[in-house]
């Protein structure tokens, strides 16, 4: 027989804290989007234009990857919160059954 020991309150607290971190991460990425994707060439020459375009392309790729990371993070937070509730309900049911 296997036993699982959890602390649903700790899981819930961790989910809340991680949710806040995710919101902060998303806000910072949104704030950085315009200045990093809209890089203006330093001069009117071809090299400056290509360099600015390269920086902008890199920033756009970063925004795509950051959006994927935010989605994975949100799924993790939701799973953690759901698991916390499930463990708490199971603990309550076991306590009621044990009397």
PLM regions with names:
Residues 1-99:
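A glycine-centric feature that highlights glycine-enriched low-complexity/repetitive segments
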């Amino acid at each position: 027989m296997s036993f699982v020991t959890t602390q649903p309150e700790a899981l819930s607290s961790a989910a809340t804290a991680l949710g806040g971190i995710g919101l902060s991460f998303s806000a910072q990425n949104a704030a950085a989007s315009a200045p990093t994707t809209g890089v203006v060439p330093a001069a009117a020459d071809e090299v400056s234009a290509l360099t600015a375009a390269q920086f902008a392309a890199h920033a756009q790729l970063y925004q795509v990857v950051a959006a994927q990371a935010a989605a994975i993070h949100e799924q993790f937070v939701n799973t953690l919160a759901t698991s916390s509730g499930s463990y708490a309900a199971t603990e309550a049911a076991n306590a009621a059954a044990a009397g």
